Amino acid sequence: MPTSQAAFPTPVPEARQPARAVEAPAPPPAAPAPSGGPRGPGALRVRPRGRHSLRGRLAAVAAIAAAAVVIFVVVRSLEGSSHTKTFAPAVPRVVIPEGSTRLQIAQIATRAGLTGSYRAAAKSSPLLSPAHYGAPRGTPDLEGFLFPATYDLAPPSPAGRLVDEQLAAFKEHFGSEEVRRARALRVTPYELLTIASMVEREAQVPGDRAKIAAVIYNRLHRGMPLGIDATIYYAIEERKGITTYTKELNEAQLHMDSPYNTRTRTGLPPTPISNPGVASIEAAAHPAHVPYLYYVVAADGCGEHAFSRTLAEFEANAAAYDAAVKKNGGHPPACKSK
């Protein structure tokens, strides 16, 4: 077991990516227009932070996943004066970081020595039906429900047992209160979970979670594209069957035809893009009461975002970040303790 309101402009691509996702799409033009270049109308405005912050975060998650398995071996002495020792069966302690995808968890399960296919086990389970939470018919897997925590599994530890433990933990943390809040926010529980999965991939500091959730709801209510690049990274990882894609997105990828491309499509992606923890679920269920539509990584380099209501405010915040990067020799600004 584990130990452990809001509103949306048409996208405008800029050659540079945001941190942890697109942080500030521009308002929609009255009618579609050609992009007109990196800063032209009709595409989502993004910032260079992506290559510094988002890719770094993705690489960090991958590194954590690679190192997250710890095997504990209980050693006991045999009777008598012999120095010989015998080893009890190892019990895998499997650590699932918040925001991991099922493909990343499958890699963790393999490295923990779990038997069987985690990917197959994470497709469906008699213990939980996504449809019960409002997921559409044909939802391909249990992404979003695979609760991140630390699990101690008794041998022989099949991968399916980890999935069972994760689903049981999810039910403990996503109950009637979250369902009630989803209803109050005019979304299904599955949509709330999807929003939580994006918050998990976007927020770098705890205090930003509820505000990022508010921006998502505010854009949804206005019919604006979310413009979150983390959804595009997820689409690429799914297509390639890889755990982590960390390269900077190119123009073709920014405009790729995918239901997960929240630059070119309005609404939510079809499924969660990660498996969120309690804090992000809480943020999605209780978004901050703020009017923000935009955010960009703050210029102080401490991981917080600068939030704004207007495109002009966003551009000023983005310019401040760009200036800080330039001042630091093209590198992300270093955080100075506050």
Identify what each model region corresponds to.
Residues 70-87:
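C-terminal region of N-terminal signal peptides and the immediate post-cleavage residues
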Residues 44-65:
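N-terminal export and membrane-targeting signals
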Residues 107-127, 138:
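A short alpha->loop->secondary-structure connector
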Residues 87-115, 183-189:
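Glycine-rich loop/hinge motif
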Residues 95-101, 120-129:
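Short, glycine/charge-rich beta-strand/loop segments that flank catalytic centers
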Residues 1-44:
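N-terminal targeting leaders characterized by basic, low-complexity, disordered sequences
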Residues 115, 129-338:
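Bacterial extracytoplasmic/cell-wall-associated proteins, especially those involved in peptidoglycan
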Residues 53-56, 87-90, 144:
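Extracellular-facing binding/remodeling surfaces
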